[in-house]
Amino acid sequence: MRIAIDMQGAQTLSAKRGVGRFTVNIAKALARVAEEDEIILVLNGAFEASVRSLRDDFHGILPQENIKVWQLHFDTKAIDPANRNLIKAAEYLREEFINQIDADIILVPNLQEGWLDSAVTSIGRLPTKSKVCSILYDLAPLIYKEELLNNIIGNWYYEKLDLTKRSDAIFTVSWSTKRDISELLHIPKENIFVLYCAIDRNQFKPITIPDGESYQLLSKYSIKQGFLMYAGGADKNKNLPRLIEAFSLLSPSLRKDHQLVFVGGCLSEETNLRDLAMKCNLEYNDLIFTGHVSDQDLPALYNLCSAFILPSFHEGFGIPPLEAMACGAAVIASNAASLPEVIDCPDALFDPYDITAIAGKIRRVISDEQFRSDLQQYGLKRSQAKEFTWENSARTALEVFKTIVPERISAANGKEEQTVGLDKLLQAIPSIGAQFNDEELFKIALSIGESFRPRNCEKLYIDVSSIAVQDHATGIQRVTRAIALQLLADQEITCNLVYSTPTIESFYLADNVEARLNNTIIAKADRNDQLVEFYDGDILLFLDLHPALAITHASYLQKLRNRGVRVFYVVYDLLPVHFPQYFVPLLRTEFIEWLDVVFQSDGAFCISKTVAEDLSRYCRENAINPSTNFRIDWFHLSADFMSSAPSLGFLPDAKHVLSLLSSRPTFLMVGTIEPRKRHAQTLAAFEQIWAKGIDANFCIAGRQGWLMEDFIEKLRAHPERGRHLFWLNGISDEYLEKVYDASTCLIVPSEDEGFGLPLVEAARHKLSIIARDIPVFREVASGHAFYFNGLEPEALSSAIQDWMKLREEGRAPSSEGIPSLTWKESAAQLKQILFRPHDCVKV
C-alpha cells in the first residue's frame, strides 16, 4: 500500500500539544513497521519553519523524496469569514495535490485544524480513488458545548465533525471516546478503531538527578519544596478550578510543604486561577505556573514531583499520566472518560465533581508513604504495557488499512486519473462562485504552479552566475565551463545552466551561456532569460564560486529546500580560512559567511579528499551545526581543457617566446599570481640559481591576483625578463598547451591548494614536477613528483638543483604515473555523488 499522511497537525499550534505528538509519532511508527508499504508525508508549505524541522525529524526514517510539500500563498484562517471562498480554493488544491500522490490510504491525523492559521483540511471536495481515514481525539467541545463552544467557532467545529463522518474509517485514542463518537455522531462502531497513544520511553523514564541539578531546576521555576504536579492546558474540561479548591482544603501543615505546580499552557488562565486561589485563602507562592517547559525539563519534573494529578472531567486519552507513571511518579486522576482505562487502578481515581473527594486523594498520596510507593511501582509497570507503544498502534492501523483498501488500481490507470483530476481542479476553482480579486487570483495561480510539477522531469540546475556576467578565466571558472559542458551533454539527465545576482532572488536560465558554451564565447547575462521554476526533486548545484550570491540567497534557498529541491555546493578550497594574511579582510569575512550557508545546504562536493577532510575538520573545530541532511563528498578534476571549451588564440610574440623556452631547461609555474602560491620565493630562488651561472628559464603563466603589486612591479622591471624570466599574463588554454610542451619541469610551491590542476596538466605533457610537500599534492601526485619543504628561497633553490642532478642521472621522479581524468570522467564522478552518495566524509 501507499499511505499518505497529512502532517498539518504537527505544523500548526497543535504541534506542541498531544495532537502534534500523536501525528509525528504515529507517522514514525508506520514508517518503521510498514515493511512492504510506502509512507508519504504531506506538508503544508505555508508553515515554512515546520517543513524544515519535520524534514530533519524524519531524516533516516523516510527518504526526503517521500516528503511532499504543497504550497499555499493566500490566507485561509477560518476565523475570518471573508476567507470562506479562499478556503474552498485551498481545499481543492490540497485534495488534488494528495490525489497526485496516487495513495491507497490518506490518513488525516486531525481534521480540526485551520481556525487560527492557514491549515486546510477537507474530505470529498474532489473525487478520489483513495480511502480516507481520520483521527478524532475526543468530543469534549460537543459534550460540553455550552462551556466550550460559542456561535462563531461552533459552526466551524460542526463542519469539521461532518467531514469526519465522510471518512472511510475513523480512529480514536480510547474505547471511551469510541463510545462517544458512535453515540453522538451516530457512526457504526465497526467503522471506529482505537489507536492508543504512547510515549517515548527513552525520554520518559526514572532518572537519578543530583541534588545540585535538582535544586537548580526547581529554582528555575520558583519551586521551593515538594510539589503536586499538573501538566496540560487550561481548557474547561481540565477542571482546574476544582483542583485549586481541593488543594485549599488541605491542612496548612501539608500545604506548607507542598506547592501546586501547573506545567504547560496554563498561562492564559493564570490570572483567573490566581484570583480563585486568593478567594480560597491560598498564598501566591502556593501556586506555580511554569508555562511550556523544555523536553529535558518535563521528565525531570515528573521525576521530582511528590505526586502527579489530572482532575479532568473529560479526556480523549490522557498522555500526561502515562508520561508521569513512566517516570516513576505516583499518579492520581479523575475516574471520568478515558482515564480509568489508561490508569487502570481504581484506588488512584476520584470523582472529578467532588471537591472533597479530590482533596482526600491528594491528602492520601502526599501523606501516606506506602500508598504513594504502591502507586509509583504500579505506574512503572502500567506504563510499560504493550498496548501503549506506537508500534502496536501502527500495526493496528495497518490492519485496518488492509481491510478497507480494494485491489490496487494499476499505476497506468492511476496516472490517467490524476491528469483528469488536475483539469478538474482548474475547473473547480472558478466554479466556487467567488469574485476573486487580481491579487487573490495571482496567489491561487502561484500556489497551483508551485505545487504541481511537470511529471518525470526532475532537473539538474547548475549555477554559472559568475561566468554569466563576466568570465575572468580563473581556474575555477575554467572548471565550471568544462564540467558544465559535460553535464549538458549527458543524455541520462536533464540539465540547465542558471544564473542570478545578489540583488535578484530568483534564478534565470542562462540561455546565452548554454548556447555558446561549445564555442567558448560566454555571453553577458540576458535579463530576458526565462525565470526558473523549481520543483520537488530538482537539484541546484553551485558549481561556480560566488559567495555573495549564496549569502544573499540563503533564505530563498531554504525555501527551495523546504519544497524538496536539493541544494549542493562545490567547495574548491578553504584558503581564506587557513591563510587569512593572504586575503583582504572583507573577502575572508565573506568566505566565512559563505561556509555558513554551505553547511545549511544538502551537501558540499570538494575537489579532493584532502579538502573534504579539511571541511569536515573545520565544521567540528568550529562547533558548526550543519543541516540534518548535510554530507561532504569529493571528486577529482580533469586537466584536459583543450577537449572541453578551451580558450583560443596566441599573443603576437608567442612563436619567439616558445622558441626561447625550448632553448634551455624551463621551469614553469601556472596559476594566478597570489601570495600563497609563493611566486616571490620562487623568483628569489632562481635569482640564486642564475647567480651561480646555471642556464635555466623561469616562466610564469598566470594573471595578476590581489596583494601582489610590489611583486608585479619587480617582475616587470627585472633585468632577466625576456631572457631567462618570462611572464605570460592571461594567455589562452591553447597557448598554455604549447608552453607546457616547451617546458622541462613544473614547479608548484603553493602553500595550499584545493586540488592542483597544473600537476595533472604537467603529467599529460610528461613534465617532471617539483612540488611543495603538502597533503593535497601527495593525494594527486603520490610518488610521481619531487617534493620539498621550506619557505625560504634557499630551500627551493636547493631543491631545484637537487632535482637537476637527479635528472642528469636519470633518477628524477616521472609524472607519467599520475592519474589523468578526462572531463567526461570528472563530470561522471560528480554526477555519481550527486545522485548516488558513496565515500562520504563524516562531519
Regions found by a protein language model. Give the residues of each.
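Carbohydrate transferase catalytic cores enriched for Leloir-type hexosyltransferases
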Residues: 1-843
